[in-house]
Amino acid sequence: MKANHIRILLLVTIAIMLISLMGRWEQTFPSNSSQSQTTQTQQDNSHYNSDTPATTNVSTSDAKASLTKTTSFSKYDDAKSVTINTDVFKNLKISLLDGAIISASLEDYSVSLDDKTPMALLTDEQGSEYIAKSTIVINKKPVDVNFESQGIKKENGKQVLTLTGSVDGLEITRTYTFDDAKYNISVSQNIKNTTSEPVSVIIDDSLARDFNPAGDSFSLLNAHSYTFTGVAYSTANDSFRKESFKDISKTNGQPTVINSQGLGWVAFIQHYFVSAWIPQSNDSKIYYKNLNNDVFEAGAYTGISIAPNQSESIDSVLYSGPIIKANLVDLAPNLEKTLDYGMLSFFSEIIFWVMNQIHSLVGNWGLAIILVTCLIKLIFYPLSAKSYRSMAKMRMLQPRVKRLQETYKDDRQVLGKKMMEMYKEEKVNPLSGCLPMLIQIPIFISLYWVLLESVELRQAPFIFWIHDLSMKDPYFVLPILMGISMFLQQKLSPAPADPMQAKIMMFLPVIFTFLFASFPSGLVLYWLTNNVISILQQWIITRHYQATHKK
């Protein structure tokens, strides 16, 4: 295959891989290749020896009433709630009914560049409700608990809210512990059985959200539509798995229960942010469901058996905040995988680490992208230089190529043979010009996901009109400059001998300008910087080669 054919194929491959394949791969095929451990009706006959004697391995039938019940958002009264403010949470409200967290805004993350209001991650706003709750199931029956607040205690940078309530002979004390600088909330429940009979209790920690999957549609011209929205979970049997809301909506209203033993977690993921319940018991079971229209729920339930006049405690952690690896890695095994860079995450994590180090020095993510690009070009300079020298030699051979084409224009087989003989004689590899592009493909894809998924770049400004590197250039200046740079780069490369190839190559800058117009401006900045450096390198090397190899 001719070198120009391969160049065209590689360019098209980049577009296809970015736009068609990579954008949906992680949603279509789970990251973990192991067989799914899910089942819709799972009976458990064995007891797991937990470190906490009070917990019991609850069967799905015991939790059936809770699993088949849809959350009613309307029952929570905003007026009957306790408000908490920390360094990271603003107006976090805990309802006195069931102790549900019905709203929480993130102090450090505004709604948009134009609206500096803290973004509401959890909300009780009608039509877009998203809450975290802990339901109590007594003897297989879910109950509502009307709590009373015992006040908030502040000490050592922490706030502790205590709620007390009673129902069906059980006295319940629930505490919420907030570290002022962290997004994780420790939830501890002490339940005392004041009756004369043993009581079976299930604690169902769950997330519930009103979400329309139809609105989460994929668009070629919206790079952010490639991101994942749905449920993620981790168990002892399945380290990390994702299920999109769109796929869950096709489960015909049946709850899915994951049969697992050992520590795990369950989460709702959206672009840049995650809410996750992390039970502290080895006997918790994970589930997710979509029983009613657009209400999606996911949670972890844990069973405890309480003897008469005895009390038992059970703990869990709720994380609700940005997807930042440093925040998640110590909370639970595999929780940091919610920062999912896709199949090339290994390279993406290296690129982000280097970018983050540079950003800590220069204080601007745009400059960090430019400097990372320069560093990448420096690392691969020996390969690029070899490629550009080969292309310069190919360019000098163009007159001979044209003569061969004129001589053997009626016999393409002989023409191909003669050209290969010429390349061999001149020690030229016609495919070497494709090497820089091959190298760029994994780097391009890795950086693409870094820019798309890293919350650190959300609303990160560059200069002048670029106020958010994670969004497209509002005036399309960078895509146009990138298209011009591609055109100039073509002019330095050997011209295709085939007129059809020449036309295709001529239109590629236009096509890519159109495609990149919807990409994050940070990604376009990388590609533009890469092209400019490549043009300078190629021009200098070509000029030097021609000057030293004149015949």
Curated annotation (Swiss-Prot):
Molecular-function GO term, any one: membrane insertase activity
Biased composition (Low complexity): 30-43
Compositional bias (Polar residues): 44-61
Chaperone listed as a keyword: yes
Gene Ontology CC entries for this record: plasma membrane
Gene Ontology annotations of biological process type: protein insertion into membrane; protein transport
Claim: Cell membrane is one of the keywords in the record: yes
Residue stretches spanning the membrane: 3-23, 361-381, 431-451, 504-524
Function of the protein: Required for the insertion and/or proper folding and/or complex formation of integral membrane proteins into the membrane. Involved in integration of membrane proteins that insert both dependently and independently of the Sec translocase complex, as well as at least some lipoproteins. Aids folding of multispanning membrane proteins.
Subunit text: Interacts with the Sec translocase complex via SecD. Specifically interacts with transmembrane segments of nascent integral membrane proteins during membrane integration.
Name this polypeptide is given: Membrane protein insertase YidC
Organism in which the protein naturally occurs: Francisella philomiragia subsp. philomiragia (strain ATCC 25017 / CCUG 19701 / FSC 153 / O#319-036)
Biological classification of the source: Bacteria, Pseudomonadati, Pseudomonadota, Gammaproteobacteria, Thiotrichales
